[in-house]
Amino acid sequence: MREFIPPASRFIELPDGFAMRRGGALYGARIAYETFGSLNAARDNAVLVLTGLSPDAHAASRPDDPTPGWWEAMVGPGKPVDTDLWHVICVNSLGSCKGSTGPASTDPRTGEPYRLSFPELSIEDIADAAAHTVRALGISRLACVVGASMGGMSALALLARHPELARTHISLSGAVHALPFSIAVRSLQREAIRSDPGWLQGHYDEGEGPRRGMLTARKLGMMTYRSAQEWDCRFGRTRIGERRRADQGRFGPEFEVESYLDFHAQRFADRFDPNSYLYLSHAMDQFDLGDGGGGGGGAPGALSRMRVERALVMGARTDILFPLSQQQEIADGLSAGGADVSFLPVDTPAGHDAFLVDIERFGPPVAKFLAIVA
């Protein structure tokens, strides 16, 4: 088991006995984060970024780590989330393997990796850990919390559980809960990992582990992150070269789209812990904003009770994983609570991953919204 920690990561310790929503507690746990841009004297220009399932806290390049970040085109000087104006905090999710405590981390009580002894993880736990991190950094109120994909779920949980912590919200391809299609896909991803003999009931060590399962899981995921329209335009029925086909043997990859999936799945499997994948994926399926909390009314009621002044809600029309109807639900619920909400459906072939790869369409509305907030 391995953790994959970016070199510029900083850490905030969680309080001992950090209670997990579905039972259990963590001791000696920590949250990894990175910051970009300067905090002003009033400490009121902080923007929190909550990530999807796989990213680390390295959203953008920094002087002490010039490696391009996973959101390099969105975060930085003069970019839509302008670090000349904003102090951006990107938090690695609790349960991940990118610096925050998760199944691959060492349990201080045993000196061994947690593996499956790590408590059941919830999106609410991720939100609570992020809220603790913000307060530990001396920030009592965020100018904005930005959440994309799973991070959109985490942001909504944070706003519900810590209503005074953020003034505004940007939701990019988020959701108040997972729909059956998304649950089915992630269920198959987890099954692929658990069915791999190398998983060993979570007790694999460094080395191969359930690599074949991880490759299949990632390929399944990538099929849902983009759209059929993009696959058609990008690959068509183009075949790989004769020599490459011969190297693969009978029934091996023949089309460029297969080669693309394999390349990116191999790269992902090299740098993500399978147990972390299982925990985070399961947390997404279990999340429902309408569960728990007082007030009733399900998810719409929870959204209407959030205390944000403004919100920007964006989603791709081609997103099959977190479809546009879920973005409309978020916008309607926040608006019912009195927030000034901008809802922007985006025409893009990039599907769910559009917030990552189609900055031409997602960037300007984000920049415009933050200019109003400033």
From Swiss-Prot:
Changing residue 52 to A: Has much lower activity for the acetylation of L-serine but keeps the activity against L-homoserine. Utilizes L-homoserine as a substrate for acetylation but barely utilizes L-serine. Pathway: Antibiotic biosynthesis. The active site is at residues 149, 319, 352. The record marks 52, 55 as: Important for substrate specificity. It is an enzyme of class 2 (transferase). GO terms for biological process: cysteine biosynthetic process from serine; homoserine metabolic process; methionine biosynthetic process. It is found in: Cytoplasm. Residues 46-357 form the AB hydrolase-1 domain. Its EC number is 2.3.1.30, 2.3.1.31. It catalyses: L-serine + acetyl-CoA = O-acetyl-L-serine + CoA; L-homoserine + acetyl-CoA = O-acetyl-L-homoserine + CoA. NCBIfam families: homoserO_Ac_trn, PRK00175.1. Belongs to the AB hydrolase superfamily. MetX family. This is L-serine/homoserine O-acetyltransferase. It comes from Streptomyces lavendulae.
